[in-house]
């Protein structure tokens, strides 16, 4: 599964560069805010040239991450589809100043501008992590423009810290304190597991002594760097191991884990999470999902911290008219890092069902 040699030859002849082995066409979308300020949005189109039904807009997570960590996820299918990725407002290649210009409404309307610039009547959205909340918001604001949704590592349609999300009344009306406690216990187990993974890898890499345990409590990289006299390179390595241990089930591919650090702008997360409109809108996305008649495909790992098990998504999809859940065993939040073949197969099915297009088209 992957890009054909003939396709690479064709792209090389056309002069398009490649990134992560995938042909890419980069451009900037220029928009003007209500106050007259200009924003240049970085856009990167990966894969084939535009053809009817082959375009998928991909929404990265964060809030405040950027697009490139998702390139390995779409690479096996870039011989069939045109994936349009972009850095959302405030993210790495789409800077805005001040952060006050970042809002949930602005992020949704930037996506609508992108749809218009691409000349598409309807769009298929593939979202990862908090990108799912952007997909939900777009569906709420522009339901007539959505052809289908592919929700990867899908954050549930609820605000953070909401102890009684709107959807519970529909999918789990008898959700009780014991259920909340059980969910909290699953998260505690997950935390112990990723810390164990971190320790095993860090010991193997010589960053920590062989007898290391969390006897001091789990310490930050700053504390560990001081305790074990790490160099900046050591500390960066430890951070990447931690990032991988949290986002994958195995942690084995930590050297290939993309994103984080300078690729993440926490100001974006702060701006969106503190935006009153976001809090209001996120309470209204569940009704929008229930009313949507297009295909919704949810792909999640069994060890994804956004919904461990999963617990909530098996119930949620029963209330969305044309929804289907694919659960991938032994995979975390970055599913393609743990189980690349299984993820590629699930994504191919989801794309065929949401776009109506297959490799033979």
Region roles according to the model:
Residues 15-40:
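N-terminal cap/lid segment of alpha/beta-hydrolase-fold proteins
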Residues 39-96:
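Conserved HGGG/HGGXW glycine-rich cap/lid loop of the alpha/beta-hydrolase fold
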Residues 105-123:
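Conserved acidic catalytic loop of the alpha/beta-hydrolase fold
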Residues 121-167:
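Conserved hydrolase catalytic core segment
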Residues 148-206:
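A catalytic-pocket lid/entrance helix-loop region that shapes and gates access to the active site
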Residues 186-299, 307:
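Alpha/beta-hydrolase
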Residues 286-328:
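Conserved loop-alpha-helix segment in the C-terminal half of the alpha/beta-hydrolase fold
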Residues 323-361:
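Catalytic active-site module of serine/aspartate enzymes centered on a nucleophile-bearing elbow/loop
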């Amino acid at each position: 599964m992957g890009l054909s040699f003939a396709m690479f030859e064709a792209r090389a002849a056309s002069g398009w560069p490649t990134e992560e082995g995938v042909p890419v066409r980069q451009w900037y979308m220029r928009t003007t805010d209500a106050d007259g300020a200009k924003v240049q949005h970085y856009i990167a189109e990966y894969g084939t040239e535009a053809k009817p039904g082959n375009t998928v807009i991909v929404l990265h997570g964060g809030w405040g991450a950027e697009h490139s960590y998702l390139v390995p996820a779409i690479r096996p299918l870039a011989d069939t589809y045109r994936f349009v990725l972009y850095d959302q407002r405030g993210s790495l290649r789409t800077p805005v100043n001040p952060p006050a210009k970042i809002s949930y409404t602005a992020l949704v309307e930037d996506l609508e501008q992108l749809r218009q610039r691409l000349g598409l009547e309807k769009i298929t959205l593939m979202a990862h992590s908090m990108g799912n909340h952007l997909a939900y918001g777009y569906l709420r604001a522009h339901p007539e423009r959505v052809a289908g949704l592919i929700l990867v590592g899908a954050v549930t349609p609820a605000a953070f810290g909401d102890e009684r999300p709107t959807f519970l009344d529909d999918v789990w009306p008898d959700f009780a304190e014991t259920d909340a406690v059980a969910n909290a216990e699953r998260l505690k187990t997950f935390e112990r597991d990723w810390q164990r993974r971190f320790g095993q890898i860090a010991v193997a890499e010589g960053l920590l002594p062989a007898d290391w345990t969390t006897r001091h409590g789990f310490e930050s990289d700053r504390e560990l760097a001081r305790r074990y006299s790490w160099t900046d390179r050591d500390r960066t390595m430890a951070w990447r191991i931690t990032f991988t241990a949290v986002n994958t089930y195995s942690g084995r591919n930590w050297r290939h884990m993309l994103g984080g650090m300078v690729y993440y702008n926490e100001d974006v997360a702060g701006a969106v999470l503190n935006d009153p409109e976001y809090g209001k809108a996120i309470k209204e996305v569940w009704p929008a999902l229930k009313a949507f008649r297009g295909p919704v495909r949810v792909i999640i790992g069994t060890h994804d911290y956004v919904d461990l098990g999963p617990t909530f998504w098996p119930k949620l999809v029963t209330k969305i008219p044309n929804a289907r859940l694919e659960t991938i065993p032994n995979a975390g939040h970055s599913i393609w890092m743990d189980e690349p073949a299984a993820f590629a197969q699930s994504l191919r099915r989801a794309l065929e069902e949401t776009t109506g297009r297959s490799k033979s088209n």
